[in-house]
Design a protein with these regions (language model features):
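N-terminal signal-anchor/start-transfer transmembrane helix
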Residues: 9-31
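Cytosolic juxtamembrane helix and N-cap/initiation of the first transmembrane helix
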Residues: 1-14, 39-43
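Cytosolic, membrane-interface loops and tails of multi-pass inner-membrane proteins
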Residues: 25-44
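Membrane-helix boundary connector in multi-pass membrane proteins
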Residues: 90-108, 124-126
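Hydrophobic alpha-helical transmembrane segments in multi-pass integral membrane proteins
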Residues: 56-59, 117-126
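Core segments of alpha-helical transmembrane spans in multipass integral membrane proteins
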Residues: 16, 42-67, 83-88
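Non-cytosolic membrane-interface motifs at loop->transmembrane helix junctions
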Residues: 4, 75-78, 101-110
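Hydrophobic alpha-helical membrane segments
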Residues: 78-93, 112-120
Length: 126
């Protein structure tokens, strides 16, 4: 897979995820945690907005770089940097269960994030 295409795929998906977090943070919180106490609080929604903004930023950086860089070492560097960011996000989400903050790990990020990481690694290393 070409690096530019991988950056655009990962960029588009992460922008959509970030938008979902920002458009309906309360709904997303309820999807993840159920109807628990505080799920619709302003603080929890504000946290979701900030997390979504970070994910959107990562996606927009990938899209921007895919449009402004030529295929080569620079695009590989962007993809490996994206892997580092996504892996950090993945570990942070998973650690919530192991640290006792949640009773289960949300399924969607445990599927989407490794898939995006695999796309980046496959393209950068290929």
């Amino acid at each position: 897979m070409e690096n530019i295409l991988a950056m655009q795929i990962v960029g588009a998906i992460t922008v959509l995820i970030g938008l979902r977090m920002n458009v309906d943070p309360v709904g997303l919180n309820k999807d993840i945690f159920g109807d628990v106490e505080g799920v619709d609080s302003g603080e929890m929604s504000a946290s979701r907005l900030a997390i979504g903004g970070g994910i959107m930023a990562l996606g927009l950086l990938n899209i921007y770089c895919s449009l402004n860089l030529d295929e080569g070492p620079a695009t590989e560097t962007v993809l490996i940097g994206t892997v580092i960011g996504l892996a950090t996000f993945f570990v942070t989400i998973a650690s919530a269960k192991f640290r006792g903050f949640t009773s289960e790990i949300p399924k969607l990020p445990m599927i989407v994030l490794p898939t995006l990481i695999a796309i980046c690694l496959y393209s950068a290393m290929g």
